[in-house]
């Protein structure tokens, strides 16, 4: 985050020079100093990718509860990004805001077909996230104006097909296996769709089931970690563990580095190269953490996506961080005894789903709970 913050002058320069807008936007393929390096233009020069960087700032606030960081870092970064995107959006015949051009990384590779009918679900999900989160930021800082809500209200809803779920764009569905699940950004990593909502549930199920149906032929290493997260979004621990096992067995070198292709020729995908990249290892680790702990809207759930194979095995973790800086430590023994300790780093209230109760703590306070499977019944 400090690195991204240090590149704000370059982001402002690129927004002005390339897009002709105010605000800030980094090139999506850049050198260490923030200079544009180029690449397939529909992805390397896509302005909505900047919103993914914004999410990193907000996630830091969400998991720390640091209001000073929200005020001095998150709000300025989001606002500068929104200034760029707002100028690029144009009102269509139906009154909805659309980008001049739209894509969905890396659908159709670098062919002309990769320019999708605006707005792609990738772009649209990120735009909704940007303006909706700005509304939340203003509310949390006590200075709501209604401005960002008015912009978000002029964005169309996500494009959905009843059988295949989230579409690529308003007039195109995903018809073949592909390494990027960019059309599913609203599920992961943006977490805009909630499985507990019946309407969202049907969209999530259709989207994930369709990806599974198309198969992993054109997936690469990071696809398996991403699919694990999509399975976790619907509490499918078995499905998540299956994808993580495939990732670890077929895409990691002996030293743990991710090599992106099925370099052992095991048959799990059609790519057999071995380019080293870092992000997929982090993605898989993130998926494991989300199997252990879910934290949304101050509702905390331990083992939200527990695989069947873990049911009778000991499980333990210490000081995983939930929303508003709540530190969670948990242990389950093989004979079904559970212990949970929560410690606050900020004042707050949280609902503990596993114990079905609210806990209110001041910074530095902790609370412990114990139960057995019989108690729970």
Could you tell me what each predicted segment is?
Residues 80-137:
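Acidic/histidine-rich catalytic neighborhood
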Residues 73, 77:
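Active-site and adjacent substrate-binding regions of carbohydrate-active enzymes
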Residues 70-72, 90-100, 143-147, 302:
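Short, glycine/acidic-rich hinge or "gate" loops at secondary-structure transitions
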């Amino acid at each position: 985050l400090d690195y991204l913050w240090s590149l704000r002058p370059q982001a402002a320069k690129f927004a002005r020079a390339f897009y002709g807008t105010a605000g800030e936007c980094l090139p999506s393929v850049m050198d260490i100093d923030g200079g544009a390096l180029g690449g397939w233009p529909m992805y390397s020069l896509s302005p909505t990718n900047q919103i993914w960087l914004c999410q990193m700032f907000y996630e830091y606030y969400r998991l720390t509860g640091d209001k000073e960081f929200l005020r001095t870092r998150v709000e300025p970064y989001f606002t500068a990004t929104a200034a760029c995107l707002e100028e690029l959006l144009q009102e269509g015949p139906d009154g909805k805001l659309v980008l001049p051009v739209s894509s969905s990384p890396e659908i159709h590779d670098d062919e002309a077909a990769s320019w999708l009918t605006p707005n792609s679900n990738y772009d649209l999900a990120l735009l909704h996230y940007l303006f909706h989160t700005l509304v939340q930021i203003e509310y949390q800082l006590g200075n709501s104006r209604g401005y960002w809500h008015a912009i978000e209200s002029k964005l169309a809803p996500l494009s959905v097909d009843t059988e295949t779920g989230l579409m690529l764009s308003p007039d195109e569905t995903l018809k073949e296996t592909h390494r990027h699940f960019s059309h599913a950004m609203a599920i992961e990593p943006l977490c805009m769709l909630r499985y507990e909502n019946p309407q969202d549930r049907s969209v999530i199920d259709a989207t994930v089931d369709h990806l599974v149906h198309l198969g992993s032929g054109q997936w690469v290493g990071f696809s398996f970690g991403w699919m694990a997260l999509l399975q976790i979004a619907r509490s499918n621990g078995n499905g998540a563990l299956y994808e993580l096992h495939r990732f670890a067995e077929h895409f990691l070198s002996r030293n743990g580095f991710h090599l992106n292709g099925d370099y052992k020729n095991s048959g799990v995908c059609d790519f057999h190269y071995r380019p080293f990249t870092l992000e997929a290892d982090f993605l898989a680790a993130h998926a494991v953490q989300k199997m252990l702990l879910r934290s949304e809207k101050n509702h905390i759930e331990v083992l939200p996506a527990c695989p069947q194979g873990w049911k009778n095995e000991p499980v333990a973790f210490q000081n995983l961080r939930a929303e508003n800086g709540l530190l969670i430590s948990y242990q389950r023994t093989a004979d079904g005894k559970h212990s949970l300790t929560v410690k606050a780093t900020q004042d707050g209230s949280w609902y503990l789903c596993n114990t079905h109760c609210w806990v209110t703590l001041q910074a530095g306070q902790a609370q412990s709970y114990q139960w057995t499977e019989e108690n729970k019944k």
